[in-house]
Amino acid sequence: AYYCFCEKAESEEDSGDFDRAEDPCRCLSQQEVAAQLAAGKPYVIRQKIPHTGTTTFSDASFGEITVENSTLDDQVLMKRDGLPTYNFANVIDDHLMGITHVVRGSEYLSSSPKYNLLYEAFGWEIPTYIHCSPVMRDAQHKMSKRHGDPSYEDLKAQGYLTEAILNYVALLGWSPRGELAEQEFFTLEELVQAFDITGISKSPAIFDLEKLNYFNSAYLKALSPEAFLAVAEPYLKQGITNPSIDLRLVAPLVQTRLNTLTEIPPMVDFFDRLPEYSNTLYLHKKMKTNEENSLEALQLVVPVFQAMTEWSFQAIHDALLHLAEAQGLKNGRIMWPVRVAVSGKATTPGGAVELCHILGKEETLRRVQQGIRQLTPQA
């Protein structure tokens, strides 16, 4: 190392970005250094990198890497304010903490030779380096919180399960080997057992939100009914404030239809309040329904519902199917108009029977009768 009294910007001090061949301080004698110090001239302390030869280091992911010493700069070790630079402090801190493996981004590969020269200068054992390629948001840009890319906390707030995030992120830039090579889903314990440094990729991985959605959807579907209700309940309550709606009945309807938990509120809000809707929802090519025959279907349904003494899923199912059969109609000719009338939506979690069962007899009849009024031509 040597004292450097040259006037340089602080950024130059930190980066070591200068032409050391022309730096007069590199070759100052002890007497010249003493004179400068006695004069109170500010200084930094730089690492004296050899001009010739090579420095070789081994990386567990990238293998053995050799660089020409002539390409390395004389990095600053101590700044003018007397504080160590990050690189210098990092080496000392890692040694004092007994760090055996240094895992960091591949952008730090170029710094490793200078780290090694410091370890060698101190006579310390060089740790194992594992440089990992960055996670990219696209082919050109790294993921960055500064540019709006999500953190773990952001993903949690967006309705992703911890287990799904962990599983997906573990497979970014790493892949299992051997008999596990084709396996996609891992518990944390399985990841611990399967992980091997040799599986780390040298190429950057691109963060694919659709793939994360795939993982999250699979994890949501795999939850037991009780476990799913526990994670979904806060979101169900955002969409449904009516205490008469049994969330335990709603939860199974949405569990298999989700990518994220935040999709739940707009999916179930019609249970709380019937939205305004267009009569065009009654038009369904496959079900062969239109406004006219939908009106007829709802008018047939009202007395059937009114006469029912048991309001269960099976009772509603049997009553509607019996009505369709008695009228010589396909089931869809009855089911679709009822579904639209009670939900006001083109797509719903669950069909007509499930929705009517959850809404209850009184609310179902109120909505069906409202549908009749809406479909009835005005004189």
Give residue spans per PLM region.
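Active-site cores that bind ATP or allylic diphosphates and position pyrophosphate for catalysis
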Residues: A1-H131, M136-M143, S151
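Conserved phosphate-binding loops in nucleotide/dinucleotide-binding enzymes
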Residues: M78-R80, M97-Y108, M136-Y168, L172-L180, ...
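Structural motif
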Residues: L155-E163, K202-D208, T241-V250, E325-R333
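Short alpha-helical scaffolding segments that buttress acidic/His motifs in well-ordered protein cores
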Residues: Y168-V169, F195, N216, A251-L258, ...
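Small-residue-rich helix-loop
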Residues: P225-Q327
